[in-house]
Amino acid sequence: MQSQSVMLELREQDEVWVRLYKGERENAVFSDEYDTYITFSGHLINFQPAAEPLGTTVLHAAVDTRPQPARYFDTGTTEPVSFFLSGLEELLAWHPSSDDEFNVCAVPLAQRQPPLHSRRPRTLLCHDMRGGYLEDRFIQGSATRNPYVFYHWRYVDIFVYFSHHTVTIPPVCWTNAAHRNGVPVLGTFITEWADGEKLCEAFLAGGEDAYRAVSHQLARIAQHYRFDGWLINIENALSAAAVGNLSPFLRHLTAEVHGAVPGGLVIWYDSILESGTLRWQNELNQQNRVFFDACDGLFVNYNWKEEHLERTRELAGQRHADVYIGVDVFARGDVVGGGFDTNKSLSLIRKHGLSAAIFAPGWVYKHLGEENFLLNEDKFWGLLEDYLPTHSICTLPLATSFSVGMGTGMFLAGKEEEAGPWYNLSAQEIQPLYPERRGWLSTSCCLQDAWCGGSSLRVQGTIPPGEERVAIRLSLWVDLGSSGFSLSICGTLASGPHRDDFTVALELTTWHSSRCHDGTVTVLPSEDEPHGRHHPHLLPAPPPALSRMLAACSHGAQGWTSRCYEQELRGCSLRDLSLLVSRQQASPQETSFSCLLGELRVLDAGSMAASPPQVQSLTASQLWWQDGPSAEQLSLSLTLRWAFPPGRAACFRVLSQGARCHRAQPAQPQLLGLAHGCQYRAVGLAVPRPAPGQSCQLELLVEPVLPSELPVGPERWGRLLLVYSEPA
């Protein structure tokens, strides 16, 4: 059917319905005192957003069907999926497409301290799980029970998604989660076996134009999908002609990636020698140094001994932090240590001032099983923490509900909004908390209860005799500037047993300032204690500028208590936010405690008065009708797209207000899912089948969730109304 457009001048009170019929029927435009209708040939209706009733509205009467490209959508459900490229032909044929926009990372790379370019030894994490692209390929998440999740980002400097496909494009959920924590993400370009030799002959032995075309495409792919570079792994022998162009290829690829991706990286895997022979060296030496010199780093194979580290450190010189010594957690081959002995390998690597590359951390999940995975995962990383320097958050606002990207239900304001298992790493939130080493104190993920998302943070332990308190801190490194800064902090807590024996309070730590003013007292740090400690003021009543935030600060909601605080600071660097657990009364005995931390927000109070943006231009496309689960129902899948200022939303909640065939009050909105970009594919919506001559309507809503998690009024949501009827 030919696409048509109709332009209507709308008055404020007008409501527009667009109805498309399948079969032969004359186009008609008519109106009555209630509605304006535009009727076309076709199948379904596209309703322009109710949020923009003024001005000119363009309505497109194009018939849409299910999305076709199997690369970007699951063939059974039409859900958007992440993908890889197989072979040189697919790589060179790749080009950006509107169908692959779901695969574009929506989260910019956050700043952290110390930055990646600091010279301290780093930690690279290389994910290798059963060939890759498992449940993590479903961009909008899946109903997976007991999935593999990674959430110890504070220990990691670089993340690599590895598979044995020629071009591994990291699933966007991993890039979103890593970027939120300030961790750059690399894809993998790999060639192996006889097919790999043929591929390398085609683009390396073929001359400068051939390898430049490959490097250009790899840089374009990283730029388009917004990840940060490549691990290059040539696992096959090369001819003299091919190996002669390998270093120029790496240099050109590195330059292309640096030009296309801010902070981009290219890392070479220890495999090929300068002669073209495939022989893993387990060190940096003169036979593989030429490739190290051509890019940003070397990932050393994992069958090394301490003498390899000594020679590597000497040869690397000032670039010692660019050498990542491989550690296979599965302990394959002759290795120093893997599994729960991985710390033995890291101890030697750090002894020589080198970076580490931890390969296949999924050992915890695959070897020990799904049961007690979170407990075993925390144990694994806890054994390594002495050798893994951590990082601090550098920007505000900071808001986290401590979701690990999975759950047994979805919670909102302490109430379970949707029951059932879910898995989506894009929905993972920051977990930057570290216990102080006084008393016994532990943190763990609680899936049974949450304030928002899928989990909360369980904090439990004992205050030992002779101590008044224990603390858990959130590490920050935020320069507040000399002009002054008003911090607003909101915490949500649920107390457990012995709740009358302890109290919970907040403390701010400032650093590196000759004069730090907290609004009432100027703190002058001494040489012995170059920091100030501040106790934020509890806000009993909402000042006008904070009323939206304090609307959520109440007592007793589903067993949770929310409190908001304010602190004026000037000329400071904000370094830590600590949760202090103190005795209610002095006691010579230890005091046990347990509580759930549901949410923590640190906001710039001065920025909260601004009105949030509005969701604009909400449209529907790629519609696919099927028979429903019963004779009275249809099943509808469609893609929603909208506009919203970049960086202004943490995510979007996509809701349905229900489908109805009679004029009735709309139902309560039901959550369909979360979107982390400005598009969402609703799959398998059960809607009523209209009777002959009857029309039904479905209303869909898009609610922006701000980085501050301040509420956004419904008048700024996106709204779309679909009106449909049986074909004539």
From Swiss-Prot:
The keyword Phosphoprotein does not apply. Residues 287-381 form the BRCT domain. The keyword Hydrolase applies. Gene3D superfamilies: 2.60.120.40, Galactose-binding domain-like (2.60.120.260), Glycosidases (3.20.20.80). SUPFAM superfamilies: TNF-like. One of its GO terms (biological process) is N-glycan processing. It catalyses: an N(4)-(oligosaccharide-(1->3)-[oligosaccharide-(1->6)]-beta-D-Man-(1->4)-beta-D-GlcNAc-(1->4)-alpha-D-GlcNAc)-L-asparaginyl-[protein] + H2O = an oligosaccharide-(1->3)-[oligosaccharide-(1->6)]-beta-D-Man-(1->4)-D-GlcNAc + N(4)-(N-acetyl-beta-D-glucosaminyl)-L-asparaginyl-[protein]. Its EC number is 3.2.1.96. Its main location: cytoplasm. Keywords: Cytoplasm, Glycosidase, Hydrolase. One of its GO terms (molecular function) is mannosyl-glycoprotein endo-beta-N-acetylglucosaminidase activity. It comes from the Eukaryota. InterPro entries: C1q_dom, ENGase, Glyco_hydro_85, Tumour_necrosis_fac-like_dom. It is found in: Cytoplasm, Cytosol. GO terms for cellular component: cytosol; extracellular space; lysosome. Belongs to the glycosyl hydrolase 85 family. Endoglycosidase that releases N-glycans from glycoproteins by cleaving the beta-1,4-glycosidic bond in the N,N'-diacetylchitobiose core. Involved in the processing of free oligosaccharides in the cytosol. This is Cytosolic endo-beta-N-acetylglucosaminidase. The gene is ENGASE.
